[in-house]
């Protein structure tokens, strides 16, 4: 949130408007299902009095929960309002670097025509399957595909099961929860208390399951513990748990950041938080280089 504050107090304030505030983030709750036995709770998100005091003393910003579906439009709008020429439905294909800058070849997916974009630098923040990092030949260490997971995004009113014990994360221990994925079933609150994301694992040594409406509904009902639950299924997807990072972040005038360079589960605040910090670190350095105020810094991940 300090990074958003640096973009402008209005940006930080708008993020708070869309976010779930700290008090509603609650505690980590462990259970056999939302309806079933509660196994325990763990204070988190700065809820312990000592942690809250430490946070208040160390930062003017407040902890909150803001899903990417709300954060990304805010950042996109802010960039456009400040003169950025932003394009949607555009796919990076390749680039060529020269002494003056970088020429990127992209595909306009609306017209199916290739276009050239000229820039002084190129930043590849294109996710865990980064084409920019691949074309750069960045060296990576670690392993991809160490576990299999599925995401099930749905709407359902679960207030009668959770409003009295608010939380962002409800960890569900059921038979099969230790197979693949993140080691447990997860019911993740997106909007209190009617929009949810379920994370469930599958055996990475087997083909990814076909997560159709019937399968997704069964998983959701099992983890909630209500076999008559009416849900509005919004989306389903499968993904792999990775454990890999780039040993170099850049080459020449081309840089990579975010999931393009470190591919790991988003647990413990290692999701958008790390990517935002990557972007902020790179942005201020490039800005000062362009102003002639900063010389080259090492491309290692620690910088």
Give, region by region, the residue ranges found by the protein language model.
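Conserved FAD-binding catalytic core of PHBH/FMO-like flavoproteins
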Residues: 9, 77, 121-243
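Internal hydrophobic alpha-helix adjacent to the cofactor/substrate pocket in enzyme cavities
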Residues: 276-295
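Core beta-strand elements of the Rossmann-like FAD/NAD(P) dinucleotide-binding domain
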Residues: 112-120
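A conserved short coil-to-beta-strand element within the FAD-binding core of flavoproteins
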Residues: 88-102
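Conserved small/polar residues in nucleotide/adenosyl-binding loops
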Residues: 296-303
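Helical element adjacent to the flavin cofactor pocket in flavoenzyme catalytic cores
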Residues: 66-87
């Amino acid at each position: 949130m300090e990074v958003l504050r640096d973009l402008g107090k209005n940006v930080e304030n708008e993020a708070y408007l869309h976010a779930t505030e700290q008090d509603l983030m609650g505690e980590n709750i462990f259970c056999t299902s939302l309806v079933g036995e509660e196994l325990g709770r763990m204070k988190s998100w700065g809820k312990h009095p000592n942690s809250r005091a430490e946070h208040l003393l160390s930062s003017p910003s407040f902890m909150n929960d803001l899903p990417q579906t709300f954060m990304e439009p805010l950042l996109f709008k802010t960039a456009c309002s400040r003169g950025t020429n932003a394009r949607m439905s555009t796919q990076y294909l390749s680039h060529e670097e020269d002494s003056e800058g970088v020429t990127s070849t992209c595909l306009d997916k609306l017209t199916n025509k290739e276009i050239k974009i000229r820039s002084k630098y190129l930043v590849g923040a294109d996710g865990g399957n980064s084409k920019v990092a691949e074309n750069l030949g960045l060296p990576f260490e670690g392993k991809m595909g160490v576990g299999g997971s599925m995401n099930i995004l749905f709407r359902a009113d679960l207030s009668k099961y959770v409003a009295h014990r608010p939380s962002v994360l409800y960890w569900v221990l059921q038979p099969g929860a230790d197979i693949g994925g993140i080691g447990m079933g997860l019911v993740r609150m997106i909007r209190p208390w009617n929009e949810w994301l379920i994370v469930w694992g599958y055996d990475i040594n087997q083909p990814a399951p076909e997560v159709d409406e019937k399968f997704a509904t069964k998983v959701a009902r099992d983890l909630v513990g209500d076999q008559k639950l009416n849900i509005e299924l919004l989306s389903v997807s499968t993904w792999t748990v990775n454990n890999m990072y780039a040993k170099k972040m850049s080459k020449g005038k081309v840089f990579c950041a975010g999931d393009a360079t470190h591919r790991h589960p988003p647990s413990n605040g290692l999701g958008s938080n790390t990517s935002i910090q990557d972007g902020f670190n790179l942005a201020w350095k490039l800005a000062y280089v362009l102003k002639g105020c900063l010389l080259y810094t090492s491309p290692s991940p620690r910088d």
